[in-house]
Amino acid sequence: FNFDKQVNIEADNLKISGAGVWHTQLHFTSDKRYGGGIVFGHNSNGIELSNLYMDSNLTSRYNEDAQYKAISGTLGKDSKIHDIWVQHFEVGMWIGDYDQTGNMKYTDGLVVENARIRNNLADGINFAQGTKNSTVKNSNIRGNGDDGLAIWSSISNGTNAAAEENNKFLNNTIESGWRAAGIGIFGGKGHEISGNLIKDVFAGAGIRVNTVFAGHNFDLNDSGIKIHDNTILRSGTTNDLYKLHRGAIDFQQVRGTIKNVDVYNNKLLNTLADPVITKNFEMGDNGNGEIRLSNNTIDNKAAIVGAVSAVSPTKPEPKPVNNPVSETSVSETPKSEGGSSTPVSEASTSEVVSETSASETPKSEASSS
């Protein structure tokens, strides 16, 4: 199905289901600003979107001017997005309400699962503008040009967005990001990042936690944020877009202090930067009181066997209906509100990790696009 404009939907308890990612394909033909994607309106609730493939003709996010997300808007209460494949957009999903009348309608209880979010020019999935109690799980996030998964407790101009709370990223594979981090946490409270495999994020940190962007940041984080039981493999860089080191895990304070964050039981393997945990402020091996580090395994000589992905295709990849996206600019600008190439199939869904040396002493320095 070809679309030459955005599809706008505002409804309650609406189910949109294709015949599967191999059979139902939505192709957005415009390469213009606001030229495509599905936008869910202010009063939507109980949406279910599933079993389809989406792509577009967008080729650039230059000057943050595309405004061309595959899925965006607010999905109200208890919506589900599952078994979809999204690629070649500005962003895979950008969830948040930008109402300027003071009548915010937050996305609450959204579940995204069994999704493939790949080869987009910016974020894979971003929970913004008060999104709460929402989860991304059991999904594959690959080859995106900004944070693979992000929680940004933003307050867009003219809105009164509340702090984000209780969002979760669970048991996902985030890989081959070529800008920013595998997972980014930019404020809010009560979030959980657990069970994720983050690998080959060569231009930034595996996980970054920072106050670079305006918003609620961490001042309201009374319930705590937990980052635990993740594996971060071959990630980090000694030379990001700002000529800075980014470790497997990176902390950066710019607009306030990072508060009440626990980081524990993570495996940080074959990191591409030293130190493995970076920061731009004073923090000891066990943290600084507000950031608490414990039982994290650092091993730069780990033996890795096999390939891992959250989703293993059972058929050949669908032939792209447009040329692979190309990035015309890599200049860093604030996250916009509101790619790569043809996918490669996974060879296996199992991996054996054996550490040849283990240290539980994390060391220590993050941004966006």
Question: Locations of the language-model features?
Answer:
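Extracellular beta-strand-rich solenoid/capping regions of secreted or surface-exposed proteins
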Residues: 2-17, 25-51, 55-76, 95-98, ...
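Short glycine/acidic-rich loop motifs that flank beta-strands on beta-rich extracellular proteins
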Residues: 3-6, 25-37, 58-65, 90-96, ...
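Right-handed parallel beta-helix
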Residues: 13-23, 45-56, 77-90, 105-122, ...
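Residue-level marker of regulatory loop/turn positions in helix-turn-helix DNA-binding domains and
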Residues: 41, 63-65, 73, 104, ...
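Short, small-residue-enriched loops and turns at beta-alpha junctions
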Residues: 100-103, 156-159, 214-216
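Ser/Thr/Gly/Pro-rich low-complexity, disordered linker/stalk segments of secreted
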Residues: 311-369
